[in-house]
Protein backbone atom coordinates (compact mmCIF):
# COMPACT_ATOMS: atom_id res chain seq x y z
CA UNK A 1 0.00 0.00 0.00
CA UNK A 2 1.42 3.43 -0.96
CA UNK A 3 2.33 5.86 1.80
CA UNK A 4 0.35 9.05 2.39
CA UNK A 5 1.96 12.41 1.81
CA UNK A 6 3.78 13.44 5.00
CA UNK A 7 2.32 16.95 4.92
CA UNK A 8 -1.15 15.45 4.56
CA UNK A 9 -0.49 13.12 7.51
CA UNK A 10 0.27 16.10 9.78
CA UNK A 11 -2.42 18.28 8.24
CA UNK A 12 -0.07 21.15 7.32
CA UNK A 13 0.81 22.89 4.09
CA UNK A 14 4.10 22.44 2.26
CA UNK A 15 5.13 25.93 3.34
CA UNK A 16 4.56 25.14 7.04
CA UNK A 17 7.24 26.33 9.46
CA UNK A 18 9.04 23.93 11.78
CA UNK A 19 7.05 25.38 14.67
CA UNK A 20 3.75 24.63 12.88
CA UNK A 21 4.94 21.09 12.11
CA UNK A 22 5.87 20.48 15.75
CA UNK A 23 2.53 21.87 16.94
CA UNK A 24 0.62 19.58 14.56
CA UNK A 25 2.72 16.58 15.61
CA UNK A 26 2.14 17.19 19.31
CA UNK A 27 -1.62 17.42 18.81
CA UNK A 28 -1.86 14.26 16.70
CA UNK A 29 0.59 12.27 18.82
CA UNK A 30 -1.53 12.98 21.89
CA UNK A 31 -4.67 11.96 19.96
CA UNK A 32 -3.33 8.62 18.68
CA UNK A 33 -0.95 7.77 21.55
CA UNK A 34 -1.15 4.01 22.39
CA UNK A 35 -1.53 4.80 26.09
CA UNK A 36 -4.72 6.72 25.30
CA UNK A 37 -5.98 4.07 22.88
CA UNK A 38 -5.10 0.68 24.40
CA UNK A 39 -5.71 -2.20 22.02
CA UNK A 40 -6.67 0.11 19.12
CA UNK A 41 -4.57 -1.08 16.17
CA UNK A 42 -5.79 1.73 13.91
CA UNK A 43 -4.70 4.38 16.43
CA UNK A 44 -1.34 2.65 16.83
CA UNK A 45 -0.81 2.68 13.05
CA UNK A 46 -1.78 6.37 12.89
CA UNK A 47 0.63 7.17 15.74
CA UNK A 48 3.51 5.48 13.86
CA UNK A 49 2.55 7.30 10.65
CA UNK A 50 2.49 10.67 12.42
CA UNK A 51 5.85 9.97 14.12
CA UNK A 52 7.46 8.99 10.80
CA UNK A 53 6.17 12.14 9.09
CA UNK A 54 7.43 14.32 11.94
CA UNK A 55 10.92 12.76 11.91
CA UNK A 56 11.29 13.38 8.17
CA UNK A 57 9.88 16.92 8.06
CA UNK A 58 11.94 18.18 11.03
CA UNK A 59 15.23 16.90 9.59
CA UNK A 60 16.43 19.53 7.10
CA UNK A 61 18.31 17.06 4.87
CA UNK A 62 15.52 14.48 4.80
CA UNK A 63 12.90 17.18 4.26
CA UNK A 64 14.82 18.56 1.28
CA UNK A 65 15.10 15.07 -0.23
CA UNK A 66 11.42 14.40 0.39
CA UNK A 67 10.34 17.73 -1.11
CA UNK A 68 12.34 16.96 -4.25
CA UNK A 69 11.80 13.23 -4.73
CA UNK A 70 8.89 12.28 -2.46
CA UNK A 71 9.03 9.03 -0.52
CA UNK A 72 11.70 7.65 -2.86
CA UNK A 73 14.08 10.33 -1.62
CA UNK A 74 13.93 9.19 2.01
CA UNK A 75 13.38 5.42 1.67
CA UNK A 76 16.28 3.72 3.50
CA UNK A 77 15.76 0.62 1.37
CA UNK A 78 16.01 2.72 -1.80
CA UNK A 79 12.66 1.42 -3.00
CA UNK A 80 11.80 3.03 -6.33
CA UNK A 81 8.61 3.53 -8.27
CA UNK A 82 8.13 2.95 -11.99
CA UNK A 83 11.83 2.53 -12.71
CA UNK A 84 11.99 -0.90 -11.01
CA UNK A 85 14.98 -2.58 -9.49
CA UNK A 86 14.88 -0.58 -6.25
CA UNK A 87 16.47 2.53 -7.78
CA UNK A 88 15.72 6.08 -6.65
CA UNK A 89 15.72 9.19 -8.84
CA UNK A 90 19.24 10.12 -7.77
CA UNK A 91 20.54 6.79 -9.12
CA UNK A 92 18.70 7.13 -12.40
CA UNK A 93 19.81 10.64 -13.33
CA UNK A 94 23.29 10.28 -11.85
CA UNK A 95 24.05 7.15 -13.89
CA UNK A 96 22.48 8.45 -17.10
CA UNK A 97 24.46 11.69 -17.12
CA UNK A 98 27.53 9.88 -15.84
CA UNK A 99 27.46 7.60 -18.89
CA UNK A 100 27.06 10.59 -21.20
CA UNK A 101 29.73 12.84 -19.72
CA UNK A 102 32.07 10.15 -18.42
CA UNK A 103 32.48 9.01 -14.87
CA UNK A 104 29.39 9.83 -12.86
CA UNK A 105 28.35 9.01 -9.32
CA UNK A 106 29.13 5.55 -8.02
CA UNK A 107 27.06 4.01 -5.26
CA UNK A 108 28.76 3.08 -2.02
CA UNK A 109 28.05 0.26 0.38
CA UNK A 110 25.17 0.64 2.78
CA UNK A 111 26.21 2.08 6.10
CA UNK A 112 25.49 -0.01 9.18
CA UNK A 113 22.30 1.31 10.73
CA UNK A 114 22.31 3.31 13.96
CA UNK A 115 20.54 1.55 16.82
CA UNK A 116 16.84 2.20 17.32
CA UNK A 117 15.64 4.63 19.97
CA UNK A 118 13.73 3.14 22.88
CA UNK A 119 10.90 4.57 24.97
CA UNK A 120 10.15 3.72 28.59
CA UNK A 121 6.85 4.84 30.13
CA UNK A 122 7.47 5.87 33.74
CA UNK A 123 4.55 6.50 36.10
CA UNK A 124 5.21 8.62 39.19
CA UNK A 125 3.20 9.74 42.18
CA UNK A 126 2.72 13.49 42.60
CA UNK A 127 5.11 13.47 45.56
CA UNK A 128 7.82 11.74 43.50
CA UNK A 129 7.36 14.14 40.59
CA UNK A 130 7.52 17.22 42.83
CA UNK A 131 10.55 16.15 44.89
CA UNK A 132 12.52 14.22 42.26
CA UNK A 133 14.21 10.88 42.82
CA UNK A 134 16.48 8.23 41.33
CA UNK A 135 14.74 5.26 39.70
CA UNK A 136 16.13 1.86 38.77
CA UNK A 137 14.74 0.95 35.34
CA UNK A 138 14.99 -2.49 33.74
CA UNK A 139 15.14 -2.07 29.97
CA UNK A 140 14.78 -4.92 27.42
CA UNK A 141 17.01 -4.06 24.45
CA UNK A 142 19.37 -5.28 21.73
CA UNK A 143 22.96 -5.17 22.96
CA UNK A 144 26.26 -5.64 21.14
CA UNK A 145 27.22 -9.32 21.14
CA UNK A 146 30.08 -9.71 23.61
CA UNK A 147 31.34 -12.91 21.96
CA UNK A 148 32.09 -11.40 18.55
CA UNK A 149 32.24 -7.73 19.67
CA UNK A 150 29.42 -6.90 17.27
CA UNK A 151 31.10 -8.12 14.07
CA UNK A 152 28.69 -11.03 13.61
CA UNK A 153 31.58 -13.33 12.69
CA UNK A 154 32.80 -16.30 14.70
CA UNK A 155 35.67 -15.51 17.04
CA UNK A 156 38.94 -15.85 15.15
CA UNK A 157 37.32 -15.11 11.78
CA UNK A 158 36.17 -11.92 10.12
CA UNK A 159 33.71 -10.85 7.43
CA UNK A 160 34.97 -11.25 3.87
CA UNK A 161 34.52 -9.01 0.84
CA UNK A 162 31.38 -9.83 -1.15
CA UNK A 163 32.26 -11.50 -4.45
CA UNK A 164 29.16 -10.20 -6.21
CA UNK A 165 29.64 -6.46 -5.68
CA UNK A 166 33.38 -6.62 -4.80
CA UNK A 167 32.79 -4.69 -1.60
CA UNK A 168 30.85 -1.85 -3.22
CA UNK A 169 27.53 -2.83 -1.65
CA UNK A 170 25.72 -2.10 -4.91
CA UNK A 171 25.41 -3.66 -8.33
CA UNK A 172 24.58 -2.00 -11.63
CA UNK A 173 21.78 -3.18 -13.87
CA UNK A 174 21.02 -1.88 -17.34
CA UNK A 175 17.41 -1.42 -18.33
CA UNK A 176 17.41 -0.13 -21.88
CA UNK A 177 18.77 3.40 -21.89
CA UNK A 178 19.05 3.58 -18.10
CA UNK A 179 21.90 2.33 -15.93
CA UNK A 180 20.37 1.56 -12.55
CA UNK A 181 22.21 0.85 -9.31
CA UNK A 182 20.65 -1.16 -6.53
CA UNK A 183 21.67 -2.84 -3.28
CA UNK A 184 23.64 -6.01 -3.81
CA UNK A 185 21.28 -8.98 -3.35
CA UNK A 186 24.07 -11.14 -1.93
CA UNK A 187 25.35 -8.93 0.91
CA UNK A 188 22.26 -6.68 1.15
CA UNK A 189 24.32 -3.56 0.56
CA UNK A 190 26.95 -4.14 3.24
CA UNK A 191 29.84 -5.07 0.96
CA UNK A 192 30.84 -7.86 3.35
CA UNK A 193 29.70 -11.45 3.84
CA UNK A 194 29.85 -13.43 7.07
CA UNK A 195 30.77 -16.95 6.01
CA UNK A 196 31.35 -18.24 9.54
CA UNK A 197 28.72 -16.56 11.77
CA UNK A 198 29.01 -16.15 15.53
CA UNK A 199 27.26 -18.94 17.39
CA UNK A 200 25.75 -16.56 19.95
CA UNK A 201 24.22 -13.84 17.76
CA UNK A 202 23.99 -15.96 14.57
CA UNK A 203 25.71 -13.32 12.49
CA UNK A 204 23.53 -10.41 13.62
CA UNK A 205 26.16 -8.77 15.83
CA UNK A 206 23.48 -8.07 18.48
CA UNK A 207 21.64 -10.12 21.07
CA UNK A 208 18.48 -9.58 23.12
CA UNK A 209 19.35 -8.51 26.63
CA UNK A 210 17.90 -6.64 29.60
CA UNK A 211 19.89 -3.96 31.35
CA UNK A 212 19.28 -1.98 34.53
CA UNK A 213 19.82 1.77 34.51
CA UNK A 214 19.84 4.22 37.39
CA UNK A 215 17.95 7.27 36.14
CA UNK A 216 17.82 10.58 37.98
CA UNK A 217 14.37 12.18 37.72
CA UNK A 218 14.62 15.95 38.34
CA UNK A 219 12.26 17.65 40.78
CA UNK A 220 9.24 19.30 39.18
CA UNK A 221 8.63 16.98 36.21
CA UNK A 222 5.06 16.67 34.96
CA UNK A 223 3.01 14.47 32.67
CA UNK A 224 4.31 14.78 29.10
CA UNK A 225 7.91 15.56 30.08
CA UNK A 226 10.54 13.39 28.42
CA UNK A 227 14.03 12.56 29.65
CA UNK A 228 16.62 11.61 27.03
CA UNK A 229 19.45 9.23 27.86
CA UNK A 230 21.91 9.45 25.00
CA UNK A 231 23.38 6.15 23.80
CA UNK A 232 21.16 3.98 26.01
CA UNK A 233 18.93 2.71 23.19
CA UNK A 234 19.52 -0.38 21.09
CA UNK A 235 23.04 -1.16 19.89
CA UNK A 236 23.75 -0.24 16.27
CA UNK A 237 24.39 -2.74 13.52
CA UNK A 238 27.96 -4.05 13.33
CA UNK A 239 29.51 -1.34 15.47
CA UNK A 240 27.30 1.57 14.40
CA UNK A 241 26.34 4.09 17.11
CA UNK A 242 23.58 3.10 19.55
CA UNK A 243 20.20 4.77 19.73
CA UNK A 244 18.87 6.82 22.63
CA UNK A 245 16.47 5.98 25.46
CA UNK A 246 13.54 8.31 26.11
CA UNK A 247 11.83 8.13 29.49
CA UNK A 248 8.24 9.37 29.11
CA UNK A 249 6.80 10.70 32.38
CA UNK A 250 3.19 10.30 33.53
CA UNK A 251 2.05 11.57 36.95
CA UNK A 252 -0.81 9.75 38.67
CA UNK A 253 -3.87 11.63 39.94
CA UNK A 254 -3.64 12.63 43.61
CA UNK A 255 -6.33 12.07 46.22
CA UNK A 256 -6.12 15.66 47.53
CA UNK A 257 -4.24 17.91 45.12
CA UNK A 258 -4.77 18.87 41.48
CA UNK A 259 -1.73 20.21 39.66
CA UNK A 260 -1.84 22.96 37.05
CA UNK A 261 1.65 23.90 35.94
CA UNK A 262 3.56 24.83 39.09
CA UNK A 263 0.42 25.54 41.16
CA UNK A 264 -1.50 23.06 43.30
CA UNK A 265 -5.23 23.23 44.06
CA UNK A 266 -7.26 21.59 46.81
CA UNK A 267 -10.65 21.87 48.50
CA UNK A 268 -10.79 22.28 52.27
CA UNK A 269 -14.04 21.71 54.23
CA UNK A 270 -14.93 24.19 57.00
CA UNK A 271 -17.79 24.22 59.48
CA UNK A 272 -20.70 26.67 59.43
CA UNK A 273 -19.53 28.30 62.64
CA UNK A 274 -15.94 28.73 61.37
CA UNK A 275 -17.21 30.31 58.16
CA UNK A 276 -19.44 32.72 60.10
CA UNK A 277 -17.21 33.56 63.06
CA UNK A 278 -13.76 32.96 61.62
CA UNK A 279 -11.04 30.79 63.03
CA UNK A 280 -7.94 28.81 62.15
CA UNK A 281 -7.85 25.50 60.31
CA UNK A 282 -5.15 23.01 59.31
CA UNK A 283 -4.41 22.72 55.59
CA UNK A 284 -2.39 19.88 54.00
CA UNK A 285 0.64 20.66 51.83
CA UNK A 286 3.22 18.38 50.26
CA UNK A 287 5.61 19.43 53.05
CA UNK A 288 3.18 18.80 55.91
CA UNK A 289 0.33 20.66 57.60
CA UNK A 290 0.13 24.45 57.89
CA UNK A 291 -2.38 26.71 59.65
CA UNK A 292 -4.71 28.88 57.58
CA UNK A 293 -6.57 31.80 59.15
CA UNK A 294 -10.22 32.00 58.08
CA UNK A 295 -11.72 35.49 58.47
CA UNK A 296 -15.27 35.87 59.74
CA UNK A 297 -18.15 35.92 57.25
CA UNK A 298 -16.23 33.73 54.77
CA UNK A 299 -18.44 32.45 51.96
CA UNK A 300 -18.14 28.93 50.56
CA UNK A 301 -15.99 28.79 47.43
CA UNK A 302 -13.57 31.49 48.57
CA UNK A 303 -10.00 30.83 47.41
CA UNK A 304 -6.98 31.29 49.67
CA UNK A 305 -3.45 31.42 48.24
CA UNK A 306 -0.48 29.98 50.13
CA UNK A 307 2.56 31.36 48.34
CA UNK A 308 5.53 29.09 47.73
CA UNK A 309 3.64 25.93 48.71
CA UNK A 310 3.28 24.65 45.15
CA UNK A 311 5.79 22.97 42.84
CA UNK A 312 9.32 24.11 42.02
CA UNK A 313 9.72 24.54 38.28
CA UNK A 314 11.90 21.93 36.59
CA UNK A 315 13.24 24.63 34.25
CA UNK A 316 13.85 27.53 36.65
CA UNK A 317 14.00 28.47 40.32
CA UNK A 318 10.36 29.63 40.34
CA UNK A 319 8.02 27.97 42.86
CA UNK A 320 4.26 27.80 42.44
CA UNK A 321 1.53 28.39 45.02
CA UNK A 322 -1.08 26.26 46.78
CA UNK A 323 -4.63 27.53 46.24
CA UNK A 324 -7.17 26.31 48.78
CA UNK A 325 -10.88 26.56 48.07
CA UNK A 326 -12.95 26.47 51.25
CA UNK A 327 -16.24 24.57 51.11
CA UNK A 328 -18.71 25.03 53.96
CA UNK A 329 -20.20 21.74 55.12
CA UNK A 330 -23.86 21.52 56.10
CA UNK A 331 -24.21 19.80 59.50
CA UNK A 332 -25.71 16.30 59.34
CA UNK A 333 -27.09 13.81 61.90
CA UNK A 334 -28.31 16.60 64.22
CA UNK A 335 -30.06 15.70 67.47
CA UNK A 336 -33.27 17.39 68.62
CA UNK A 337 -31.50 19.99 70.75
CA UNK A 338 -29.21 21.01 67.91
CA UNK A 339 -32.13 21.33 65.52
CA UNK A 340 -34.02 23.49 68.01
CA UNK A 341 -31.02 25.77 68.46
CA UNK A 342 -30.75 26.22 64.71
CA UNK A 343 -34.45 27.10 64.47
CA UNK A 344 -34.06 29.66 67.24
CA UNK A 345 -31.04 31.10 65.46
CA UNK A 346 -32.95 31.29 62.18
CA UNK A 347 -35.83 33.09 63.91
CA UNK A 348 -33.42 35.79 65.07
CA UNK A 349 -32.63 36.51 61.41
CA UNK A 350 -36.29 36.94 60.37
CA UNK A 351 -36.95 40.37 58.92
CA UNK A 352 -33.29 41.24 58.56
CA UNK A 353 -32.21 38.97 55.72
CA UNK A 354 -30.70 41.85 53.76
CA UNK A 355 -28.36 42.54 56.64
CA UNK A 356 -27.31 38.95 57.25
CA UNK A 357 -27.69 37.40 53.77
CA UNK A 358 -27.08 40.17 51.22
CA UNK A 359 -26.49 37.74 48.33
CA UNK A 360 -29.70 35.83 48.95
CA UNK A 361 -31.69 39.06 49.34
CA UNK A 362 -30.25 40.43 46.12
CA UNK A 363 -31.04 37.19 44.31
CA UNK A 364 -34.69 37.12 45.39
CA UNK A 365 -35.11 40.81 44.58
CA UNK A 366 -33.85 40.01 41.08
CA UNK A 367 -36.28 37.09 40.74
CA UNK A 368 -39.19 39.29 41.87
CA UNK A 369 -38.30 42.00 39.34
CA UNK A 370 -37.95 39.37 36.58
CA UNK A 371 -41.53 38.14 37.05
CA UNK A 372 -42.86 41.70 37.34
CA UNK A 373 -41.26 42.61 34.01
CA UNK A 374 -42.55 39.38 32.49
CA UNK A 375 -46.16 40.15 33.46
CA UNK A 376 -46.11 43.86 32.64
UniProtKB/Swiss-Prot annotation:
The CR-type zinc-finger regions cover: 132-210
* Any GO BP annotation: DNA replication
Keywords for the protein's UniProt record, in alphabetical order: Chaperone, Cytoplasm, DNA replication, Metal-binding, Repeat, Stress response, Zinc, Zinc-finger
Query: Which Pfam families does this one have?
Result: DnaJ, DnaJ_C, DnaJ_CXXCXGXG
Annotated Zn(2+) 2 binding sites: 162, 165, 184, 187
Tagged with keyword Repeat:
yes
Q: Where in the cell is it found?
A: Cytoplasm
- What cofactor(s) does the depicted protein rely on? Zn(2+)
Subunit (UniProt): Homodimer.
Family per similarity comment: Belongs to the DnaJ family.
Return the protein name.
Answer: Chaperone protein DnaJ
Q: Could you tell me which species this protein originates from?
A: Shewanella loihica (strain ATCC BAA-1088 / PV-4)
Q: What is the lineage of its organism?
A: Bacteria, Pseudomonadati, Pseudomonadota, Gammaproteobacteria, Alteromonadales
> What gene is this protein translated from?
dnaJ
Amino acid sequence: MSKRDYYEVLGVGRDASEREIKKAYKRLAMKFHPDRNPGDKAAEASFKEVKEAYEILTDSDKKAAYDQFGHAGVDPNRGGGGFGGGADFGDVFGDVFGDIFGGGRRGGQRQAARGSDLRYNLELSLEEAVRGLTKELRIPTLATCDLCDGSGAKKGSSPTTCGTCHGQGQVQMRQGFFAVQQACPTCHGRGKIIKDPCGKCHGEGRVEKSKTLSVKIPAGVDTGDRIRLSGEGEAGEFGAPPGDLYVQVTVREHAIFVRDGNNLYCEVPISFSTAALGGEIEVPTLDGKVNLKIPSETQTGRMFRLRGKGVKSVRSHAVGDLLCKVVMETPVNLNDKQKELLREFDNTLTGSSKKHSPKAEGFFDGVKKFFQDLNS
